[in-house]
Amino acid sequence: MQPPPDEARRDMAGDTQWSRPECQAWTGTLLLGTCLLYCARSSMPICTVSMSQDFGWNKKEAGIVLSSFFWGYCLTQVVGGHLGDRIGGEKVILLSASAWGSITAVTPLLAHLSSAHLAFMTFSRILMGLLQGVYFPALTSLLSQKVRESERAFTYSIVGAGSQFGTLLTGAVGSLLLEWYGWQSIFYFSGGLTLLWVWYVYRYLLSEKDLILALGVLAQSRPVSRHNRVPWRRLFRKPAVWAAVVSQLSAACSFFILLSWLPTFFEETFPDAKGWIFNVVPWLVAIPASLFSGFLSDHLINQGYRAITVRKLMQGMGLGLSSVFALCLGHTSSFCESVVFASASIGLQTFNHSGISVNIQDLAPSCAGFLFGVANTAGALAGVVGVCLGGYLMETTGSWTCLFNLVAIISNLGLCTFLVFGQAQRVDLSSTHEDL
């Protein structure tokens, strides 16, 4: 006999926290999953110059392809968070990873289906964005339910370091594959590894019964009980929630601009430099920076510092100080200095994992996936505009300084908003959850 839908949903929601061995196993697995997510995501930026030469794209057209990822990415954030809150984030992550891994692996085939290269690549990037958009909201939902509050920042920073691992792996291995076998091999590499990871999670960490129950709850499309509805009116009446949204928007947009355009910046500004240096070093620095930020954040809280004080300190590093080094990138002609500034900016941005990303879980742990989805939707929309605007500014002015000025403006807007209005008290508690 199958359990009642409400009971199945409670089972899948994961009301119990992970034991220490379970937490260690899932943390390592999710670290690898985040790594592969960014392997797939950063494959296109690594290949942009070579693909532009093959297909005759200019910077505006390359900007369209790069930014089209965010057109899809912004549409599934809230859905991913809601599904994670409802059926369990691990199921959402597994199902989406199987799809984006397949799309990545067949991208070279799509590029050669017809002469409409730009249209097919834009379509594949939109689809990739749709599939990857559910990942971080579902991850936030999963960790808010399964990880102790005192360990949340460090766990999130470990898993979040996968973004740097993935970009580092693509930068290091991808640069060699690009030189030896051509740009197509990078997509085969990242897509194939993702599908292997999906098989591992399905084989060793999730049972077939778990996925069947999850799909069954979705297929029944039963209305969520009033007790489990998202108190969205209550949430968005709070200035702290809006501060979190604006800060996450700024952090995501700044990161997406640098992720999309830094490879092109180095290849055009320093054409004789070795690609593996500028594609590897910034992300190599970012990994220990991410882990250190999580350790420092949890240590300060355990020492008695207020949570909001620690979160604001992390954001000051992640948005404020990182933007200073981004500005420096536009005012140097030295390759070594550029690598140092890029490494410092990217490394300091990882402090956002222990700032705003965890602050969202502070504010609303019962619906953290939904709220993170809303905030990351705003960030993805800003990413679309930011990446396209960056390409337009460089095409019209011929200067990279405009791009880095844009990053600094966006970062400091988010920082100022969070410093003034940010809080860490729960805002999702109410005897009656309001709904439309």
From Swiss-Prot:
Q: Does the keyword Lipoprotein apply?
A: no
**Record comment: activity regulation:** Activity is chloride-dependent. Inhibited by AMP-PNP, gammaS-ATP, diadenosine triphosphate, 4,4'- diisothiocyanatostilbene-2,2'-disulfonate (DIDS) and Evans blue.
- Family annotation (Gene3D superfamilies): MFS general substrate transporter like domains
Q: Which is one Gene Ontology cellular component term of this protein? A: lysosomal membrane
Family, per entry: Belongs to the major facilitator superfamily. Sodium/anion cotransporter family.
Subcellular localization: Cytoplasmic vesicle, Secretory vesicle, Chromaffin granule membrane; Cytoplasmic vesicle, Secretory vesicle membrane; Lysosome membrane
Source species of the chain: Homo sapiens
Q: Which gene encodes it?
A: SLC17A9
Membrane topology, from the record: Multi-pass membrane protein
Enumerate the GO terms in the molecular function aspect. ADP transmembrane transporter activity; ATP transmembrane transporter activity; guanine nucleotide transmembrane transporter activity; purine nucleotide uniporter activity
Q: Which Pfam families match?
A: MFS_1
Protein name per the record: Voltage-gated purine nucleotide uniporter SLC17A9
Q: Does the keyword Cell membrane apply?
A: no
One GO biological process term: purine nucleotide import into lysosome
What residues form the membrane-spanning segments? 64-84, 92-112, 118-138, 158-178, 181-201, 239-259, 276-296, 316-336, 369-389, 402-422
Catalysed reaction, written as an equation: ATP(in) = ATP(out); ADP(in) = ADP(out); GTP(in) = GTP(out)
Domain of life assignment: Eukaryota
